Swiss-Prot record:
GO terms for biological process: protein modification process; SOS response; translation. Mn(2+) 1 binds at residues 255, 267. GO terms for molecular function: ATP binding; metal ion binding; ribosomal S6-glutamic acid ligase activity. The keyword Cell cycle does not apply. Its cofactor is Mg(2+); Mn(2+). Its EC number is 6.3.2.-. It comes from Histophilus somni (strain 2336) (Haemophilus somnus). One of its GO terms (cellular component) is cytoplasm. PROSITE patterns: ATP_GRASP. ATP binds at residues 148, 185-186, 194, 218-220. Mg(2+) 1 binds at residues 255, 267. Binds 2 magnesium or manganese ions per subunit. This is Probable alpha-L-glutamate ligase. It comes from the Bacteria. The gene is rimK.
Length: 299
């Protein structure tokens, strides 16, 4: 197969592992930055064209056809990355997470709404408009309060407000800067830990418990967190698969938390990192992703 990976940083661990696994299985793979693409629409055939420019001084060239697409772009490239995914979906090319599912997962509030609609428990959450009083809005959520920007990954854009006064101050400041925030209950009993479930297709292929640094409420690897192996219950496996299906994803990193209220889904990531979970679990997740693509291509 001829594969295309959409990625801004090809040297990242996840991109390199996927490249190695694809090539080891006999596939050709290109790694391209979606922000260097140009999409063209025309009333005359061909109606859809995709060009690529290696750098600002180079001559753009028309990209060839591909058999499958692997999206690995970050939140800052979501708009262009999803436009490229839609281009390929229009041409009936298999995308390992298409643009529709990707956009659902990348919008934190929308994803919480969709999960809740399907009866999947999430932390108590609230979203207020720019003209709604921050002082009144924050009363809907417990204190301490988690504040999150609607788009972001790797723990970036997540703030713990220790009291209502600081929460209101943060909300008012960021609202003035046109940065909307969602509010969530802080689950204190979790003590800075969560469970990452890596889902491919209809199977949870790997898991780990993530542990935040001392005095750090975020358990993300990129925030200095560590990880250890963990055994999932059958209920947790079912929940991770249900959350993945709810957003229409083929591949997902589902973050769960064990709370006094029961199991909660914190987030569903459409482009989950491989490094920490491969090293913790000892499972070759990159290979399983390539095998999943092969199975879809043979259908």
């Amino acid at each position: 197969m001829k594969l295309l990976m959409l990625c801004r940083e090809p040297r990242l661990y996840s991109c390199q592992r996927l490249k190695e696994s694809a090539e080891d299985n006999g596939h050709q793979i290109d790694i391209l930055d979606p922000n260097r693409c140009l999409l063209k629409l025309s009333k005359n055939a061909p109606h859809f064209e995709l060009y690529y420019q290696v750098n600002s001084k180079s001559e753009p060239y028309l990209l060839p056809d591909y058999d499958a697409i692997i999206p690995r772009f970050g939140s800052t490239s979501t708009r262009m990355g999803c436009a490229v995914l839609r281009h390929f979906r229009t041409k009936n090319v298999f995308c390992l997470n298409d643009d529709v599912a990707f956009l659902k997962a990348r919008d934190k509030w929308l994803s919480l709404q969709l999960l809740t609609e399907q009866g999947i428990a999430v932390p108590n959450s609230a979203l207020s408009g720019a003209e709604f009083s921050a002082t009144q809005a924050i009363l809907q959520i417990q204190s301490p309060t988690i504040l999150k920007t609607l788009h972001g990954s790797q723990g970036i854009g997540v703030i713990l407000a220790e009291n209502r006064k600081s929460a209101v101050s943060i909300m008012e400041t960021l609202t003035q800067a046109d940065v909307p925030l969602l509010m969530q209950d802080f689950i204190q009993e979790a003590q800075g830990t969560d469970i990452r479930c890596f889902v491919i297709g209809d199977k949870v292929v790997a898991t780990m418990q993530r542990i935040g640094q001392e005095d750090e409420f975020r358990a993300n690897f990129h925030r200095g967190g560590s990880a250890e192996k963990i055994q999932l219950t059958e209920q947790e496996k079912v929940l991770a698969l249900k959350a993945t299906k709810c957003l229409g994803l083929d591949v997902a990193g589902v973050d769960l938390i064990r709370s006094k209220q029961g199991l909660l889904v914190l987030e569903v990531n459409a482009s989950p990192g491989l490094e920490m979970i491969e090293k913790t679990s000892g499972i070759d997740i990159a290979l399983q992703m390539i095998v999943h693509i092969e199975k879809q291509f043979k259908r």
